[in-house]
């Protein structure tokens, strides 16, 4: 068996990535989220495949086909809710994974980090298009509002929006192409994940101390395979509690009303995992400015390696930047709350303050905190 594992051209690659991979001996449970994201991706592809067997991407029958899946297909309700809530678990793991990367300075592995940002954009695009497919009220109006943002692009905006819609409004052509893209993107994401891993294995994993761990490595299997398995069981437990007890808690009741272009819902809002970005978008009165802020809210992550001022890699021994980090986390929670609120006083002003704070903490306060900590270190 050892001979096959180490000599076979294909199994050898798997061996170097998941079995004999030298891993730092001290990585904590915060390093579990990579494998959990892989598990989420597998769950989403499998449940999505079975849903696609029964779904019809036609405006006349899309809503009915989803109802048919839940009512008539064997375990269709289970597959549907695993897919919908699986997306939420996916984003919870994503946010924790990115948060871990920021906390422990993993963004200094620039290729891996940038690949991760591309993956984040790809997953967000996939989730957005998936939300349109059930063709409920929030599906239709969410698609209309978000795609319409592209009309803010000077000169080509309006043409671009009509090109994406395949007509003069969100209609049959839009739904069909969104289904096609929603189906193909997870496979593109899988390919990007392999590139992400390729870049990671060039440098090796970071660890909670932020120090070089070459002197103290252990094999990935069995130590981290068993640790990842525990994480996977906890993820599946959380997912199944959500699916079997509270399947609709994260959804919008409006999406149980079939799409009606003549009736606008009182509050158009995306799924919970986009609310922070939606709040940033809404906090700027100008359309183009809002779109730019929306894109920058994610793209700003690419600046993090260049905004790193500290002599230390992670925040483990940096109390001032730690404080800034947790204020940033609280700020993102405030933005998520504001994104789900109506556009009225005092929510507008809170959203604007939280949006300014978000960018200021990342671009100004965290780098300054790093410099102050350097000075304190030099005083020693």
Swiss-Prot record:
Describe how the cofactor binds.
Binds 2 heme b groups non-covalently.
Q: Which domain of life is it from?
A: Eukaryota
GO terms for MF: metal ion binding; ubiquinol-cytochrome-c reductase activity
GO terms for cellular component: mitochondrial inner membrane; respiratory chain complex III
Question: Where this protein primarily resides, as one coarse class?
Answer: mitochondrion
Topology in the membrane?
Answer: Multi-pass membrane protein
Q: Name one Pfam family in it.
A: Cytochrom_B_C
User: At which positions is heme b b566 bound?
Assistant: 97, 196
**List of residues binding heme b b562:** 83, 182
Entry-linked PROSITE patterns: CYTB_CTER (PS51003), CYTB_NTER (PS51002)
Q: Which residues cross the membrane?
A: 33-53, 77-98, 113-133, 178-198, 226-246, 288-308, 320-340, 347-367
Ligand binding (a ubiquinone): 201
What are the entry keywords? Electron transport, Heme, Iron, Membrane, Metal-binding, Mitochondrion, Mitochondrion inner membrane, Respiratory chain, Transmembrane, Transmembrane helix, Transport, Ubiquinone
**Could you mention a single GO BP entry for this protein?**
mitochondrial electron transport, ubiquinol to cytochrome c
**Assembly and interaction partners:** The cytochrome bc1 complex contains 11 subunits: 3 respiratory subunits (MT-CYB, CYC1 and UQCRFS1), 2 core proteins (UQCRC1 and UQCRC2) and 6 low-molecular weight proteins (UQCRH/QCR6, UQCRB/QCR7, UQCRQ/QCR8, UQCR10/QCR9, UQCR11/QCR10 and a cleavage product of UQCRFS1). This cytochrome bc1 complex then forms a dimer.
State the remark under miscellaneous. Answer: Heme 1 (or BL or b562) is low-potential and absorbs at about 562 nm, and heme 2 (or BH or b566) is high-potential and absorbs at about 566 nm.
Q: Which family does it belong to?
A: Belongs to the cytochrome b family.
Instruction: From the Swiss-Prot or TrEMBL record, give the protein name.
Output: Cytochrome b
Native organism: Lemmus trimucronatus
């Amino acid at each position: 068996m050892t001979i096959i594992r180490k000599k076979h051209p294909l199994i050898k690659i798997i061996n170097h990535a998941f079995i004999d991979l030298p891993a730092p001996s001290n990585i904590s449970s915060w390093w579990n989220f990579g494998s959990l994201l892989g598990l989420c991706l597998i769950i989403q592809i499998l449940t999505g495949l079975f849903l696609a067997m029964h779904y019809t991407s036609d405006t006349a029958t899309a809503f009915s086909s989803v109802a048919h899946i839940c009512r008539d297909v064997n375990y269709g309700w289970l597959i549907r809710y695993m897919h919908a809530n699986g997306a939420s678990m996916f984003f919870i793991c994503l946010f924790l994974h990115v948060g871990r990367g920021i906390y422990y300075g993993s963004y200094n592995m620039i290729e891996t980090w940038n690949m991760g940002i591309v993956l984040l954009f790809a997953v967000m695009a996939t989730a957005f298009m998936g939300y349109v497919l059930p063709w409920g009220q929030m599906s239709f109006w969410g698609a209309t509002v978000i795609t319409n943002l592209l009309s803010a692009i000077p000169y080509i905006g309006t043409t671009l929006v009509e090109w994406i819609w395949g007509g003069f409004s969100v209609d049959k052509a839009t739904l069909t192409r969104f289904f096609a893209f929603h189906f193909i993107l997870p496979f593109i994401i899988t390919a990007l994940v392999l590139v992400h891993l390729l870049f990671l294995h060039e440098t090796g994993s970071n660890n909670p101390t932020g120090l070089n761990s070459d002197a103290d490595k252990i094999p990935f299997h069995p130590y981290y395979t068993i640790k990842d398995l525990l994480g996977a069981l906890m993820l599946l437990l959380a997912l199944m509690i959500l699916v079997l007890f509270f399947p609709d808690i994260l959804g919008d009741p409006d999406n149980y009303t079939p799409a009606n272009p003549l009736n606008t819902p009182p509050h158009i809002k995306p799924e919970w995992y986009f609310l922070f970005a939606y709040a940033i978008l809404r906090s700027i009165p100008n359309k183009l400015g809002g779109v730019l802020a929306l894109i920058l809210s994610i793209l700003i992550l690419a600046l993090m390696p260049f905004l790193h001022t500290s002599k230390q890699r992670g925040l483990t021994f940096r109390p001032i930047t730690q404080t800034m980090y947790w204020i940033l986390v609280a700020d993102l929670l405030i933005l998520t709350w504001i994104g789900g609120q109506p556009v009225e006083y005092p929510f507008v002003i809170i959203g604007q303050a939280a949006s300014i704070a978000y960018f200021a903490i990342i671009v100004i306060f965290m780098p300054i905190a790093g410099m102050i900590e350097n000075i304190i270190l030099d005083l020693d």
